[in-house]
């Protein structure tokens, strides 16, 4: 019987074979475990209008499932806010946490396919790190992902993408993401 070997994600292989060594040289780490890596990627889609029309959340859930390849978790309002006509427990967003191979595949698709397809894209802001090497950025619509059929979009939806790393500061996090292929703006 032949054993089928599991195909490793392209970006994961590149990280293990090239990027780890480059980061170790750049920051002179004493221990291999100090080299920063990616822990998880959280993709969040807030659908505030779902407070008025509950059907809107379904479109967001379908889009996120197509983009990430994983069923999203529906986020509910934690407290009522009268001005927004919002009741506690109403669905107002959807999020997906990607880890492991799915995370590497998503990052690869994001960097090599989705970001270059954005109109008038000048690069990601290098200032959106949180102080601990984690990076968060927003996308204004979902059409740049090739999994989404542009003709079937009911409305453009933005999303927040957070890349959580084991880096201890912004400099290490920025170096890691730059090596992974994130296109940062030059100041």
From Swiss-Prot:
InterPro entries: Ribosomal_uL5 (IPR002132), Ribosomal_uL5_bac-type (IPR020930), Ribosomal_uL5_C (IPR031309), Ribosomal_uL5_dom_sf (IPR022803), Ribosomal_uL5_N (IPR031310). One of its GO terms (molecular function) is tRNA binding. Signal peptide: none annotated. Keywords: Ribonucleoprotein, Ribosomal protein, RNA-binding, rRNA-binding, tRNA-binding. GO terms for cellular component: ribonucleoprotein complex; ribosome. It holds the Pfam family Ribosomal_L5. One of its GO terms (biological process) is translation. This is one of the proteins that bind and probably mediate the attachment of the 5S RNA into the large ribosomal subunit, where it forms part of the central protuberance. In the 70S ribosome it contacts protein S13 of the 30S subunit (bridge B1b), connecting the 2 subunits; this bridge is implicated in subunit movement. Contacts the P site tRNA; the 5S rRNA and some of its associated proteins might help stabilize positioning of ribosome-bound tRNAs. Part of the 50S ribosomal subunit; part of the 5S rRNA/L5/L18/L25 subcomplex. Contacts the 5S rRNA and the P site tRNA. Forms a bridge to the 30S subunit in the 70S ribosome. Belongs to the universal ribosomal protein uL5 family. This is Large ribosomal subunit protein uL5. It comes from Nocardia farcinica (strain IFM 10152). The lineage of its organism: Bacteria, Bacillati, Actinomycetota, Actinomycetes, Mycobacteriales. The gene is rplE.
